[in-house]
Amino acid sequence: MEFNKAQNIIGLRVLNDNVIWLWEKDKSVVVIDPAIHEPVIRYIDENNLYIKAILQTHHHSDHIGGTKYLIERWPNVQVIASSKDKKRIPFQNISVEDGETLNILGEEIKIIEVLGHTNSHIAFFVNGESPVLFIGDTLFSGGCGRIFEGTYQQMYSSLERIKSLPKNTLIYCAHEYTKANLLWALNLKPKDQDIKNKLLQVEKKLSINELTIPFLLDEEMKINLFLRAKNLKEFTFLRENKDLWV
């Protein structure tokens, strides 16, 4: 477990490579994709906080595994998830759809459907001077999510939606995959200086046990081959190549 503070958002590293994000404001906390519950409860108790809401980007067990235990501790918590996932996230009590907006911690949050990794994956976008996107497993620094339930077209379209957001959007994904993704990218683009420079930055952070996420959309568009893909055919080639990468 480790902490990484930016804009009152704390990252807890858990399991092998998951990151649980805690968005804190005035002693209230919004938890994003709690893979497990123990470190969340520990942090909440040690800092005299309480959980206002839980945001679920999708149904995979390493994103919802801690939710039922957090609900037991805070039974009035709002659990926000896609209306398409009522069966797979049965403890949700606020069901949302693409384009819907919510007010949480005094901020307007827009729901963005980002299909591909699953057929019901959503992201949570907080607009403002310093926009924030909680993206789950759709986009990683240097990579994107595997396509388990959706199609290549859906994932490509989801990434295009992300690219249309303000370029200063700070993106919070749910896994620390950056170094592995960049090594794969360099295997395809060995002379790409932007990717080389990014890898050096990432290795420096990892050497002192810092998270390499979140990341800025503007910078990510320079080093992420999936975001640089010019069309569906190019994206499909990259995704299939990445799936075979060991």
Curated annotation (Swiss-Prot):
Cofactor mode of binding and number, as noted: Binds 2 Zn(2+) ions per subunit.
Binding site for Zn(2+) 2: D62, H63, D137, H175
Pathway: Secondary metabolite metabolism; methylglyoxal degradation; (R)-lactate from methylglyoxal: step 2/2
InterPro entries noted in UniProt: Clx_II_MBL, Glyoxalase_II_hydrolase, HAGH_C, Hydroxyacylglutathione_Hdrlase, Metallo-B-lactamas, RibonucZ/Hydroxyglut_hydro
Cross-referenced CDD domains: hydroxyacylglutathione_hydrolase_MBL-fold
UniProt keyword terms in alphabetical order: Hydrolase, Metal-binding, Zinc
MF annotations from Gene Ontology: hydroxyacylglutathione hydrolase activity; metal ion binding
Binding site for Zn(2+) 1: H58, H60, H117, D137
GO biological process, one term: methylglyoxal catabolic process to D-lactate via S-lactoyl-glutathione
EC number(s) on file: 3.1.2.6
Alphabetical list of Pfam families matching this protein: HAGH_C (PF16123), Lactamase_B (PF00753)
Known cofactor(s): Zn(2+)
Superkingdom of source: Bacteria
Keyword Metal-binding found: yes
Catalytic activity annotation: an S-(2-hydroxyacyl)glutathione + H2O = a 2-hydroxy carboxylate + glutathione + H(+)
Protein family per UniProt: Belongs to the metallo-beta-lactamase superfamily. Glyoxalase II family.
Function: Thiolesterase that catalyzes the hydrolysis of S-D-lactoyl-glutathione to form glutathione and D-lactic acid.
Complexes and interactors: Monomer.
Matches recorded under HAMAP family: Glyoxalase_2
Entry protein name: Hydroxyacylglutathione hydrolase
Native organism: Prochlorococcus marinus (strain MIT 9312)
Highest classification ranks of the organism: Bacteria, Bacillati, Cyanobacteriota, Cyanophyceae, Synechococcales
